[in-house]
Design a protein with these regions (language model features):
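Extended alpha-helical scaffolding segments used for macromolecular assembly and cargo binding
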Residues: 3-91, 95, 100, 104, ...
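TPR-repeat structural position
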Residues: 10, 14, 30, 43, ...
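Structural signature of alpha-solenoid helical repeat junctions
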Residues: 12, 32, 38, 45, ...
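N-terminal regulatory/sensing modules of transcriptional regulators
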Residues: 26-28, 141, 187, 264, ...
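Helix-turn-helix DNA-binding segment
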Residues: 479, 486-544, 548-565
Length: 565
């Protein structure tokens, strides 16, 4: 029909495209409307529709669609259209270099006078949002807070009838500033902003945005000293939500959730599960993403390989983290240098270990984690007396400066090196006392990773089973250090009645603590529908409880493996 139209009435084609664009715009189909306007070469109309919808499309995970639409504009279009220029800047944050993004922002601001008066408040808001996202990409706290103030001022200047339409923009702003605050150590402010973002995202039914807030709240829980179980619950909810909507492999929201969950599982010694999540996060980031997420993924790989005793691989991963670090603000608290020192020391290479240690400031070396790093070098240099001396302020609580994401890890590592040093000094009772104390600290959370960092395997094997209150954890640690895998329950029998797509979506939420009405809210269905699906799921999986259903689903590969119980 199109070919026939071109042959018989080519003059009407653009008119028909304009009519189609108007119809799609009227019926809230912006992408189709923009494409028809572009086909009609009605660039002004296409630009207006795109600049009015690109943020919403971003927040639906449709960045590739936006970039495709932008690519269809003439190359020179942005030079006379500041609104299009700011859209190009926003689209480029995850795919272009920072210089190109900045040049588009500068171009938009220089041409701000060309924006019609009635559109200027919204234009100023989009400029402020783009600057906030740019600061978030770098992890720059001062720039992010300054941009957030500009966003708040621009929102206040909007007409009252437009404010409800800006809720999704507010979620993005709150999440962005919360993420920057989190990774620069301003955890209390981060939690406040991320909680606001999460609640607002749920209220306006924006699950894509909820994933990011949930995942970062999971990290914040650990930084706040909350239980690992609480942080793990939030991270599992974030991944379940991403899985349910097909966004688990999304580089902007899915990849961070997978990376954070993988890193959490590394700390618990669940290395095989952790690797699955880190692999998926890495694959997603191969397409696009942020340097901050890439930093977390590479650091997670370093911790995993260090825990597995693959020291060369750990060193390579931490060095990759070190190469990413200059692309981010100095405020970002993830710093691989301490771990690089530890890996070198564990390899017996004390010269490069000390060379890296010399890069740390006196304050960093005197921090709780810094003293632990120094202790590992001293232990490798056969100076156990100095190890005990260096660690005393950490163990006694006199050293309060924290240089790690989780202070509990600092305490556990310090006690482990103290135990190793006292063992070398022949102070058997003191070594056992330190080890018993560290087992008590670790057992409440199931923390295993630090036991793989310190040279304590022999000490753990000799630790008397009859004299410890933590025999179960001790056995589990030794299993992990020996490289054992979780015991398999054998080949899972296939399902006689396959789960439907709708039932599979519900299954992905079962590992979380969400109740049926909450799952229904996430999936935008009724609670009764979820309860019906649950009955069918239990029947098909031959399960009598939610826990049995989760275990059976994991056996069948419908869910990622869970923690060995």
């Amino acid at each position: 029909l199109r070919l026939e139209l071109r042959r018989t009435d080519p003059a009407s084609i653009n008119s028909l495209h304009r009519k189609a664009a108007a119809w799609y715009a009227e019926h809230a189909h912006p992408v189709e409307a923009i494409r028809h306007a572009q086909a009609a070469e009605d660039w002004r109309h296409a630009s207006r529709m795109l600049t009015d919808s690109y943020v919403s499309l971003f927040l639906d995970g449709r960045r590739a669609t936006v970039r495709g639409l932008l690519a269809d504009f003439p190359p020179e279009a942005a030079t006379t259209d500041p609104e299009l220029a700011i859209a190009l800047a926003g689209a480029g944050l995850f795919a272009r270099g920072p210089e190109e993004v900045t040049s588009y922002i500068d171009l938009a601001e220089r041409q701000a006078g060309m924006v019609p008066d009635e559109r200027r408040p919204l234009f100023k808001l989009r400029v402020a949002y783009t600057k906030l996202w740019q600061a978030g990409r770098r992890g720059d706290l001062s720039e992010a807070r300054e941009a957030m103030r500009a966003v708040e001022e621009a929102v206040a200047a909007q007409p009252a009838d437009r404010l409800p339409q800006l809720a999704e923009h507010q979620v993005a702003a709150l999440t962005t500033v919360g993420v920057v605050e989190l990774w620069t150590g301003e955890v209390a402010d981060a939690v406040r902003h991320l909680e606001e973002a999460r609640e607002l995202a749920r209220r306006i039914e924006r699950p894509y945005q909820e994933i990011g807030a949930l995942a970062h709240l999971g990290v914040a829980a650990r930084m706040n000293g909350e239980t690992f179980a609480n942080g793990l619950r939030l991270l599992e909810q974030a991944v379940a939500l991403a899985e349910a909507h097909g966004w688990a492999d999304d580089p902007i929201e899915g990849a961070p959730a997978l990376a954070f969950l993988g890193s959490e599982l590394v700390c618990l010694g669940r290395f095989e599960e952790a690797e699955l999540h880190l692999v998926r996060a890495e694959r997603a980031l191969a397409r696009e993403g942020t340097h901050l997420t890439e930093l977390v993924v590479r650091y997670g790989w370093g911790m995993l390989r260090f825990g597995q005793g693959r020291l060369e691989d750990a060193l390579a991963a931490f060095r990759q983290t070190e190469r990413i670090r200059p692309l981010l603000s100095e405020d970002v608290i993830i710093d691989p240098r301490g771990r690089i020192v530890q890996v070198w020391a564990r390899m017996g290479e004390t010269a490069p270990a000390r060379a890296t240690l010399d890069e740390l400031s006196p304050q960093e070396r005197d921090s709780r984690f810094g003293r632990t790093v120094v202790a590992q070098i001293l232990l490798a240099e056969d100076s156990p007396e100095q190890v005990v001396e260096v660690l005393a302020p950490v163990i006694e609580g006199a050293s309060e400066v924290s240089w790690q994401v989780d202070p509990r890890m600092e305490s556990i590592e310090a006690l482990l090196y103290d135990a190793a040093a006292r063992d070398e000094l022949g102070e058997a009772r003191a070594a056992e006392a330190s080890l018993e104390r560290v087992l008590e600290l670790a057992e409440s959370e199931g923390i295993i990773l630090p036991f793989a960092f310190a040279p304590v395997q022999g000490l753990l094997k000799r630790h008397p089973r009859h004299g410890t209150a933590h025999a179960g954890l001790l056995s589990q640690i030794l299993d992990v250090l020996a490289g054992s895998s979780p015991a398999s329950r054998g080949e899972a029998a296939p399902l006689l009645d396959e789960l439907s797509e709708a039932e599979l979506r519900v299954v992905r939420y079962l590992p979380s603590n969400l109740k049926a009405p909450e799952i229904a809210a996430e999936l935008f269905v009724s609670p009764n529908t979820v309860r019906t699906h649950l009955r069918h799921i239990y029947s098909k999986l031959d399960a009598h409880s939610r826990r049995e259903a989760v275990d059976r689903a994991r056996e069948l590969g419908l869910l990622a493996p869970g923690r060995v119980r």
